[in-house]
């Protein structure tokens, strides 16, 4: 049964959703993204977030209280490839570090419409290479939500093409797998999904692709090869725009004989694992269990 808290969050999302002038909003983001991201001081103090000086891309770190850590997490945040990290991201990552003995790295990759997909991918590469130097690839997790989930999968495909080691786990939360949003079943999700603006997503995807075909696998990783990648886990809600493509991805994996953890949460909205709801607590427990498990896929993924 769906929690009251999740219904309340959905109500808030519906209540606060605004009609957008897509062209005007993209111009606002273009202007905003010319400036560096500034982590609010209150979040920095509350979650003990530090900034690394090792990389050309601004990269923030959260550490568990127990050191040395067991896992390194490269987290690629969502936001339609045009938005910077939100408060919910930091709250989720703080909870992750408390439940998983880990250090989380959050590179604030370049955003559209100012930058395109290769700018984002290449900005993340030095961070991943640094994690490889710290320990074994099996202890590395690449995780992302929404656009960050799509970028996580595309980045893993990029690593495979370059012959670099795969991470131990790829955790995709409500991933944006196909920026074309051409799956006809997506239209059926519009009445159920209160959060993203479909028209804005379509234009953001075009801006992220630039002059490259939007079906290029590094933009829309559902069109890429997945047999040579690390262990893949997908979390998705049944009230999401991205549900049809997540199901398509699961079918594709099954046909290719690629085992994945695929977890659907009934009546959950976009990126539900980052919200303060009981379903998110359960999803986080599952994420930690997946990362810590030596068996794959997990047999018992009951909610």
Tell me the role of every PLM-derived stretch.
Residues 1-67, 299-303:
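A glycine/proline-hinged amphipathic helix-loop "lid/cap" segment
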Residues 54-60, 64-303:
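Alpha/beta-hydrolase superfamily serine-hydrolase fold, recognizing
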């Amino acid at each position: 049964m769906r929690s009251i808290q999740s219904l309340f969050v959905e109500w808030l999302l519906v209540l606060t959703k605004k009609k957008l002038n897509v062209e005007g909003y993209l111009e606002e983001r273009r202007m905003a993204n010319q400036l560096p991201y500034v982590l609010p001081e209150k979040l920095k103090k509350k979650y003990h977030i530090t900034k690394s000086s090792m990389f050309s891309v601004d990269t923030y770190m959260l550490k568990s209280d127990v050191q040395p850590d067991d896992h390194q997490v490269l987290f690629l945040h969502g936001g339609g490839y045009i938005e910077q990290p939100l408060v919910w991201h930091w709250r989720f990552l703080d909870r992750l570090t408390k439940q998983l003995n880990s250090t989380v790295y959050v590179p604030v990759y370049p955003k559209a419409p100012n930058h395109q997909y290769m700018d984002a991918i290449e900005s993340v590469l030095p961070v991943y290479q640094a994690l490889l130097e710290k320990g074994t690839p099996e202890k590395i997790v690449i995780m992302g939500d929404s656009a960050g989930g799509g970028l996580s999968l595309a980045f893993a495909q990029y690593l495979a093409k370059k012959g670099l080691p795969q991470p131990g786990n790829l955790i995709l939360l409500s991933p944006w797998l196909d920026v074309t949003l051409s799956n006809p079943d997506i239209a059926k999700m519009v009445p159920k999904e209160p959060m993203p603006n479909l028209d804005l997503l379509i234009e953001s995807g075009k801006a992220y692709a630039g002059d490259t075909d939007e079906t290029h696998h590094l933009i829309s990783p559902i069109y890429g090869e997945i047999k040579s990648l690390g262990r893949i886990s997908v979390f998705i809600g049944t009230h999401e725009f991205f549900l049809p493509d997540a199901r398509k991805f699961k079918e594709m994996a099954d046909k290719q004989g690629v085992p994945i953890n695929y977890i659907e949460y009934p009546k959950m909205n976009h990126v539900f694992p980052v919200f303060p709801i009981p379903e998110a607590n359960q999803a986080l427990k599952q994420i930690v269990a997946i990362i810590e498990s030596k068996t794959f896929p997990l047999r018992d993924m009951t909610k």
